[in-house]
């Protein structure tokens, strides 16, 4: 079992973090449970360590302070370390700042203080399109497909920075999500919730990222579709993609 520790500093914790290596299954994932009295509206100061990974971190978020409104911090000194091959899960109550953390890692929420590194490069507040070119993908929780476009057209949107590589990347994504190739002409708006998640993840994988940020991919899905979603996440991880996932069912 992977060892996970959350070292609290000043604020009471509002999240817990689970970590698993590439080959770790649900039963093998370690989890740290934070203070049971959460701080609504702020993600706490926490430092995450998963097992004893080798080498330098792939992504390293250090003491991030961020928020949407002037003077109102949602992240209040949050730190997270992701190594090659890991799946790091972030869990916590609604309003704790989990989605805000992912958005700050993807350049969608301004980081007011702290530092974000990718392979040692400072990417703090880098634009999302620049992060995509550096190997970071993001799948939002809602409105994560273009409903009036076909599956194939959605995937083409994911390869907008490398259109000449579309065929190669489509084959790569289809190897993980075979259904997408079989139904590539179907409108994304006609798909079920689980199928939309496959399209959204597939689109994020079209640039072959090394880091994939997933925001609650099983939200609103039936238990059966949740199981299928987690199987796909593990397949993505086995394909060489490190994952940071916000998930209420992180134990899976």
Name what the model sees in each region.
Residues 3-4, 18, 35, 41-252:
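Glycine-rich phosphate-binding loops of nucleotide-dependent enzymes
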Residues 7-34:
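N-terminal intrinsically disordered, low-complexity tails
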